């Protein structure tokens, strides 16, 4: 029978196996998903951008290929036309969105680093979807406040957030106003490398440990928000979909 110490070590070791490629505990199973249904159907521009991003020193920040495929299909299913993305990086998820939208679809994209976006921009332009994107460099909160001041409440069909986790709740307070009733907000990284269930003494990378409490706080708040229906999925690093069902509290 395992002792408490042995069990703690087992849990910590198990946590180390989770999250470095996906939340699946088997790399072989994740590779099977990628090689069977993701990579063979990945649009050529997305493949090119994924390979460019893989060479970036911060490549861990990119949306995974399976999540990109999921977002692309989701946007088609809900017939999204007017969308927003907070946190762009090199633009992999942005490209997945742009390819899914109709010719007159629009994406308001925000990131504090234009340089990373411009790394992927030639691929986006070659794919013929750059005209759908309105990129704004800088913090998102002032832009969101201005949208509300300009009367843009309820004007977005879909909003994807993959940015600074310590601001997720601040974003939510504003995005719930900007997404339409029946529209979706997708919060990325809501299982945060699996750390949301890691024991207190688990060996976590510094940035994972720092943002863990913010992710836990967000998850708790979303679960209690009566204005939305939610669905948390173990795709990529965890994504929580929030469907707005109520105008206000």
Curated annotation (Swiss-Prot):
Q: Look up the domain of life of the source.
A: Eukaryota
Pathways involved:
Aromatic compound metabolism; phenylpropanoid biosynthesis
Q: Which positions bind S-adenosyl-L-methionine?
A: 63, 85, 87-88, 93, 111, 140, 164
Please tell me whether the keyword Metal-binding is annotated for this protein. yes
Please give the catalytic activity noted in the UniProt record.
Answer: (E)-caffeoyl-CoA + S-adenosyl-L-methionine = (E)-feruloyl-CoA + S-adenosyl-L-homocysteine + H(+)
Which InterPro entries does this UniProt record tie to the protein? Answer: Cation-dep_OMT, SAM-dependent_MTases_sf, SAM_O-MeTrfase
Annotated positions binding a divalent metal cation: 162, 188-189
Query: Which top EC class applies here?
Result: transferase
Sites where the protein binds substrate: 21, 162, 193
Q: What is its EC number?
A: 2.1.1.104
Cofactor(s) the protein requires to work: a divalent metal cation
What UniProt keywords apply to this chain's record, in alphabetical order? Answer: Lignin biosynthesis, Metal-binding, Methyltransferase, S-adenosyl-L-methionine, Transferase
Name the Gene Ontology molecular function terms of this record: caffeoyl-CoA O-methyltransferase activity; metal ion binding
Record text on cofactor binding: Binds 1 divalent metal cation per subunit.
- Can you cite a GO biological process for this protein? lignin biosynthetic process
What family does the Swiss-Prot or TrEMBL record give for this protein?
Belongs to the class I-like SAM-binding methyltransferase superfamily. Cation-dependent O-methyltransferase family. CCoAMT subfamily.
What does it do?
Answer: Methylates caffeoyl-CoA to feruloyl-CoA and 5-hydroxyferuloyl-CoA to sinapoyl-CoA. Plays a role in the synthesis of feruloylated polysaccharides. Involved in the reinforcement of the plant cell wall. Also involved in the responding to wounding or pathogen challenge by the increased formation of cell wall-bound ferulic acid polymers.
Its subunit composition reads: Homodimer.
Please state what the protein is called.
Caffeoyl-CoA O-methyltransferase
């Amino acid at each position: 029978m395992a002792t408490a110490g042995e069990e703690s070590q087992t849990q910590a070791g198990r946590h180390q196996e989770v999250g470095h490629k996906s939340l699946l505990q088997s790399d072989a199973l994740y590779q099977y998903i990628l090689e069977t249904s993701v990579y063979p159907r990945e649009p050529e521009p997305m493949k090119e951008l994924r390979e460019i991003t893989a060479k970036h020193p911060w490549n861990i920040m990119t949306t995974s290929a399976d999540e990109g495929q999921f977002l692309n299909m989701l946007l088609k299913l809900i017939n999204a036309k007017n969308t927003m993305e907070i946190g762009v990086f090199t633009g992999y998820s942005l490209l997945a969105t742009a390819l899914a939208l109709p010719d007159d679809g629009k994406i308001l994209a925000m990131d504090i680093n234009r340089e990373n976006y411009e790394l992927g921009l030639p691929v986006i332009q070659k794919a013929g979807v750059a005209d759908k994107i309105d990129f704004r460099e800088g913090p998102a909160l002032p832009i969101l406040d201005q949208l509300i001041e300009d009367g843009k409440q309820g004007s977005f069909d879909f909003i994807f957030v993959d940015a600074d986790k310590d601001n997720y709740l601040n974003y939510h307070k504003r995005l719930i106003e900007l997404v339409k009733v029946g529209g979706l907000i997708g919060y990325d990284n809501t299982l945060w490398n699996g750390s949301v269930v890691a024991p207190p003494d688990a060996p976590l990378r510094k940035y994972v440990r720092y943002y863990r409490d913010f992710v836990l706080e967000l998850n708790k708040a979303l679960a209690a928000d009566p204005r939305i229906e939610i669905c948390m999925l173990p795709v990529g690093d965890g994504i929580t979909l929030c469907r707005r069902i109520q105008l206000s509290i």
